[in-house]
């Protein structure tokens, strides 16, 4: 059972935060296909005041809203390969008109995590092929 991801244990070096918009985070792309990291904070912004996120933390998952016809759904999707625009788009999709009062973000703290375990965990949450935030390979 330990070889498969589960909701009942946490991955070392991964943490979750819930923030309202504007988040107050300045993201920067690591490199193509490697995701985004926290480059800095907006001075006095929510993320800085909350104090949980650190510069250098890597965004590994985020809630996003997907709209199909007259229906919508919000889910946590892996963000490890997102480029800057995709990450910002996913964050921005969490709008009050869809009943989203916050954005849930999961971060990896480099040096405190096991990247292989993190990858295995998030492979479980890989979005379906029709997800608008799924990167084209």
Q: Whereabouts are the PLM-identified features?
A:
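Intrinsically disordered, Ser/Thr/Pro/Gly-rich linkers and terminal tails that flank
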Residues: 1-137
């Amino acid at each position: 059972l330990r070889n498969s991801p589960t909701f009942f244990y946490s991955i070392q070096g991964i943490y979750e935060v819930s923030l309202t918009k504007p988040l107050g985070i300045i993201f920067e792309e690591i490199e193509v296909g490697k995701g985004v990291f926290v480059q800095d904070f907006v001075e006095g912004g929510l993320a800085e005041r909350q104090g949980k996120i650190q510069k250098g933390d890597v965004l590994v998952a985020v809630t996003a809203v997907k709209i199909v016809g007259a229906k919508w759904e919000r889910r946590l999707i892996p963000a490890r390969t997102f480029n800057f625009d995709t990450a910002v788009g996913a964050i921005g999709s969490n709008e009050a008109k869809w009943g989203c009062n916050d954005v849930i973000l999961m971060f990896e703290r480099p040096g405190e995590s096991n990247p292989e375990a993190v990858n295995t965990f998030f492979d479980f949450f890989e979005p379906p092929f029709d997800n608008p935030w799924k990167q084209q390979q």
